[in-house]
Regions:
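C-terminal alpha-helical cap/extension of soluble enzyme domains
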Residues: 17, 21-23, 32, 184-187, ...
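Catalytic alpha/beta core domains of metabolic enzymes, predominantly
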Residues: 111-112, 125-232
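Glycine-rich phosphate-binding "P-loop"
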Residues: 121-122, 144, 256
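Active-site beta->alpha loop and helix N-cap motifs at the rims of alpha/beta catalytic domains
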Residues: 1-127, 137
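Short glycine-rich loop/turn motifs that provide flexible caps or phosphate-binding loops at active sites
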Residues: 24, 29-32, 62-64, 146, ...
């Protein structure tokens, strides 16, 4: 954001920074993209701008989740028109539906598109989890519902997803601090906050783990683990936007209310980490 408006120059610069690394894809208008405070019009415009900036070099997955099924379907359809290659759909928040309600909710979204859908289970934000049973039922009925972003805080849950869904279903870590434990249990990668800044280290770590070179992956993981934790000292994306500005990648760290700017204490913690890791 810049003076209350979407900072499209910063968005283009951030996408360019990502494309310099060997990333596999971009997520637009997720939590880190401040989707909760975007209007529907802005939501679609940001997706369209991300697709244009990516230039077909990597797929763009658009966040289209909502706690209203009709709204999620509408967002998904509009995101597809805007050029998204797939959709990240978070569990409905606040109204806390039953597991059967979740199945019907995701089913209606799946029936609105043939493009890949990534389910997003994050109980700490939504108050509910997407059960293994619901995930398996959706995958059986709708093969394009083929990926899970798991921010469960539990390696046990990831293990259950991997065991139940098989090798063709992609389970992705949704927590930078748990990337390596999740991948050791069978996750295939990460949808990352830290990689907004640390593109090359994250790509190299994930690739090493996929190659079963856990010694190399662990070295990177342990080096950057304090950063993975520090960027969640305050609500995401406030700390990572500060980090990106300090690194000269974006010009504005501004966020919209009810998010507020970084406290001085967290700035000092991040500044010390930048110096320690050689990021500035």
């Amino acid at each position: 954001m810049n003076q209350g408006a979407v900072a499209y120059d910063d968005l283009e610069a951030l996408v360019a920074h990502q494309l310099k690394g060997n990333i596999n894809g971009l997520v637009s208008v997720g939590t880190t993209g401040e989707s909760p405070t975007l209007s529907h019009k802005e939501h679609v415009e940001v997706i369209r701008a991300t697709v244009a900036a990516a230039g077909g070099k990597v797929p763009v997955i658009a966040g289209t989740g909502s706690n209203s099924t009709d709204e999620a379907v509408d967002l998904t359809k509009n995101a597809e028109v805007a050029g998204a290659d797939g959709f990240l759909v978070v569990a409905p928040y606040y109204n806390k539906p039953s597991q059967e309600g979740l199945f019907q909710h995701f089913s209606q979204i799946a029936e609105s598109t043939e493009k890949p859908i990534v389910l997003y289970s994050i109980p700490s934000r939504c108050g509910i989890e997407i059960s293994v049973d619901v995930t398996a039922r959706l995958y059986e009925k709708y093969p394009h519902v083929c990926c899970m972003k798991a921010a469960e805080g539990s390696c046990e849950k990831v293990t259950e997803y991997v065991r139940a869904l098989g090798p063709d279903y992609a389970v992705m870590s949704g927590d930078d601090g748990l990337i390596l434990p999740f991948m050791s249990a069978g996750a295939t990668g990460v949808i990352s906050v830290a990689s907004n800044l640390l593109v090359d280290p994250l790509v190299q770590m994930v690739q090493a783990a996929k190659n079963n070179d856990y010694a190399t992956a662990r070295e990177t993981y342990l080096k950057y683990y304090p950063f993975f934790k520090a960027i969640f000292l305050e609500p995401n994306p406030v700390p990572i936007k500060y980090a990106l500005k300090q690194a000269g990648i974006i010009q504005s760290e501004e966020v919209r209310l009810p998010l507020s700017g970084l406290t001085d204490g967290t700035r000092r913690v991040l500044d010390a980490l930048f110096a320690e890791l050689g990021l500035i």
